[in-house]
Amino acid sequence: MRFLMILLCSLLWTAQGYASIGNVILHEGNGEIERTTGESQITVKDLDVFSYDVVKTGNGKTVIEFVDETRVDVTQHSKLIIDEFVYDPNTKTGALSLKASLGTVRYASGQIAKNSKQNVKISTPTATIAVRGTDFALSLIHI
């Protein structure tokens, strides 16, 4: 009985520790999502996305919608790292930090940017963008 209780508690902790923060709403071509466990999953529509995932596209495009309605389009030959995502659906506040390290990414603000503007950051290898509730695209070119 004791073993069963420990197992049940560990399963509940794991489920809460790895809650989905959004999902892939559109995917074309090839791409993958690297998990913190080191495993990679082929990107498909409706695939769950988690904090600390790394989204990579080859000859394709991946569109992610987070639970706060933030939308990020990762175009071909791009890489996006989800550094932080915290969201309280009751207050519609939280924090979002993304790192675009290659290619082109389009960002459209959701509830976090509308209600916690100071807590949204998009960074690149050479700059950080403080988002103030907007829609923009950025391209990174390696020379």
Please report, for each region that a protein language model flagged, where it lies by residue.
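Flexible, surface-exposed loop/linker segments and immediately adjacent secondary-structure boundaries
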Residues: 18-59, 63-141
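Bacterial N-terminal signal peptides
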Residues: 5-13
